[in-house]
Amino acid sequence: MGTVHALLTGINAYPADRCTPLTGCLNDVEAAEELLVRRTGGRLELTKLLNGDATVSSVASGIQHRLGRARPGDTALFWFSGHGTEQPATEPAHLDIEATGRCQALVCVDGLLVDKRLGVLLDEVAAGGVHTVAVLDCCYAGGATRGRHLTERFASPDAAWFAAAARDARIPERPAKHVLLAATRLDQPSYEGRFKGRAHGLFSYALLGALRAASPTATYREVHAAAQSRLLVSSTYQRPTLAPAEPGGIADQPFLGGTGARVPSPYLLGEDRRDGWQVDCGSGHGLPPGPGTEFRVTRPDTPRRTPGRTAAVGRAVRAATVGPERTLVEPVCWSPKPAEVYPVALSALAVPPASVTLTAPDDPAATRALARAIAEAGPGGGPSPLLRRVGRPEDAGALLFRIEARGGQAHVLRRDGSPFVAPLPLDGPEDADRVAACLVHLTRWHQLRDLEAPPSPLTGRIRLEIAPWGSDTPLVPDSDGEIACRYGLGPAGPVPPLVSVRIRHLATTGRRLWCVLLDLTDSYASHTGLFDDGRFVGPGHTGYALDNRPVQLSLPAHRTPRPGAFVRDWLKLIVCEGELNTVPFHLDRWDPLAPLGSRGSALRHADGLLRFDAPERSSRDAHPEEAGGPGQWATQTVQVRTEVPRC
């Protein structure tokens, strides 16, 4: 296994006469370092350039001489968190390749590192047989900041800096030999914000969260798509980019070239003499902090099946304290044997609540009504475990609802000010209750969409594929992290695309696995009907959505398929050893006109836990009951964009 050579660069303290100071870049670097240390298992050569040390020459030298030490089989990572900028291209060679007529650059503390020069430096490292990756969390374009609570990572163009930088720039080879994960498209700004009081780049926060939850063998394409979904919670104006994105290329290789990758074994429950019972799974594996999460003892796969282990199958332990690498637990109504070690699987997930802020400067009565409705949104008219009021957006967690009451309406907004839903009326007490019901509904939907299993023995065993109907070649996410499916043109107008949705069991031997396919729509619905509410798929076999009939992707019936119109779906595959009760995964679309109390999801999630239990009744597939319920599980998510072409 090779070594990871990492150069992490973060700049908060820019010259005041050149750039606006930032606050989250050093936090990005610190969090990236923590993840790398955990992921590489000691095979890490780390260099950091922070604030005043991050000059143009030191960054370029760091890539050449620090990352340049890497040898074939090693991995080189360049991470930059700071300002970006752009300027009209003036060099003839640049004009030949800059279709927009503009050059982009990283803003170092004393000048600019033009992206073309950066590309050459990284490709020179990759030319030696080194797996090379760059993560850039900065702007490559301007534009007005759209969210009062976000800071733009963009520096105004400086002609003197660009003139000096352009002279040093060379034209990189095509195609690039390194993989790039960038915070934005070329025409978009990049932002930073605060999460639980700590500043981070929106992209860095989303990417690091996706990596913590990802399997050790997750590819750049998979990680990029997961980060894109996470970032969408905070901003619709910033779209991360993956390059090059061609199928079968470097984008489909494991992150960091697979360094540190291994097939995860089942998590184990054992006793520590000092701290008591613990499971070797913690926040570093993607487990959310806080109590409530549960594990259940599963049947051992090894020949060493002691009577104590077998008798304990199906027993539960509940998390008390979640640490980075382990979780202290309390047995639920049973007493494990002190000398025994039990394999366990995650059976109930305490998903963090959404944060809510209220703003109604001209309507104190609306503030009181909304505050009351949110405080009584839980079971029996009490607090909901899904919602948490915070005083400032800066104190919020990843999912933030900014409620602004104005003009007799409640606006439910993201961090960047974009709306989650259309404005809701706010004329009376029942309207405030409807706003609270909306927040609970949106929270449940986001918890389902963003559900990721910690590394599991089932990871990679089954693959979800989407292909054009009649084709054997699966589609892959593009540079925006989405599979794009476009309407065709028929005699009567636009024709919706037809696709085949397939679930392949990649193993040739072993056990069959239970597969549930969720369709999460951008109307905030979740249903499991594409794959019959769940089925077993045997080794070497393939399951087909709708019994191998075409799946039509289309706009909702009430929307006209005009050029440029689009909808998004997130297809989430949940793979388990045994059958899974899918009731907690059903969610009707959000309908502001539906009577309050008609949405059946409220009681299913009264305790704020997402449970992985066996169904009350067995499926139509006859088979012996699986002891211990669904057992080990894994997830895969594919984001699909169905659009009407503009021309």
Question: What does each of the following model-derived ranges do?
Answer:
Residues 10, 29, 115-237, 520, ...:
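Active-site-proximal C-terminal subdomain of hydrolase catalytic domains
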Residues 3, 53-81, 85-150:
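Caspase-like (clan CD) cysteine peptidase catalytic core
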Residues 77, 296, 514-518:
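Beta-strand signatures of extracellular beta-sandwich domains
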Residues 2-21:
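Short glycine-rich His-centered loop
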Residues 144, 351-647:
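Secretory-pathway glycoprotein ectodomains that are cysteine- and/or Ser/Thr/Pro-rich
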Residues 41-50:
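Short beta-strand elements in bilobed, periplasmic/extracellular small-molecule ligand-binding domains
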Residues 6, 171-172, 187, 214-276, ...:
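Caspase-like cysteine protease fold
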Residues 263-280, 285-353, 526, 531:
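Beta-strand/loop-dominated core regions that host nucleotide or nucleotide-derived cofactor-binding catalytic loops
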